[in-house]
């Protein structure tokens, strides 16, 4: 199921890029997608989104269910990664049950990083 969800999102992104006429790699519609690159000089993977760059964490979390990625999720990914890139941190806020925690966990999973959730209201 994880691969189907990821492939469906990739298909939707490609369709959107074609419809919007994106032809250059420096256009924001392409830059705002989370992409993985191999750095042969360091022999390691890095993730890039907009002007933020992160090393892949290699934290294997299994092949569990993935979040269905929507355009809003893509916007949250850009916002969160830009904040982290600027060393500002990220604290999603909003009504209960809207996917803040799951979106954060999914971004951490895509980056190969561990995500620990603490519920201080219980």
What are these regions (language model features)?
Residues 1-71, 75:
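Extended, charged/polar low-complexity intrinsically disordered regions
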Residues 75-81:
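Hydrophobic/aromatic-rich, well-ordered segments within soluble, folded domains that form packed cores
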